[in-house]
Amino acid sequence: MAMKIRLARGGSKKRPFYRIVAADSRMPRDGRFIEKLGTYNPLLPKDSEDRVKMDLERVQYWLGEGAKPTDRVARMLEAAEVLPKTERNNPKKAVPGKKAQDRAEEKAAKAAEASEAPADEAPAEEAAAE
């Protein structure tokens, strides 16, 4: 049986509330689960202690049994220092787009030309007469 530790949505429309549950991966998101492991209330402020509550002993038990946490639950477990932090990398986000790269190259070329030209054509400044 493939086990998952995931969020099951509760609450009403526009007022989400989630249970952190251990469930068979084939069951529906809000359907039957094996054990409730905690709660997550996204409406509370991020620094609130009540935002995420988990029974860490039971979470570690289910991880030992082979349950795989979903991405969101894995981040919560990393914050609780149950799982080691995984390095996330998005290198393409830092690279500017093609047009921006072209503009930067043109600007660099103009700056190079401008720095060469004024050295030759710069007129000598005359001393101000008093």
Curated annotation (Swiss-Prot):
TM annotation in the entry: none
Entry annotated with the keyword Ribonucleoprotein: yes
Cellular component GO terms, alphabetical: cytoplasm; small ribosomal subunit
Keywords tagged on the record: Ribonucleoprotein, Ribosomal protein
GO BP term (any one): translation
Domain of life: Bacteria
Biased amino acid composition, Basic and acidic residues: 99-110
InterPro entries: Ribosomal_bS16, Ribosomal_bS16_dom_sf
Biased composition (Acidic residues): 118-130
Alphabetical list of Gene3D superfamilies matching this protein: 3.30.1320.10
Molecular function terms from GO: structural constituent of ribosome
Region feature (Disordered): 82-130
Pfam families: Ribosomal_S16
Family: Belongs to the bacterial ribosomal protein bS16 family.
Record protein name field: Small ribosomal subunit protein bS16
Species assigned in the record: Dinoroseobacter shibae (strain DSM 16493 / NCIMB 14021 / DFL 12)
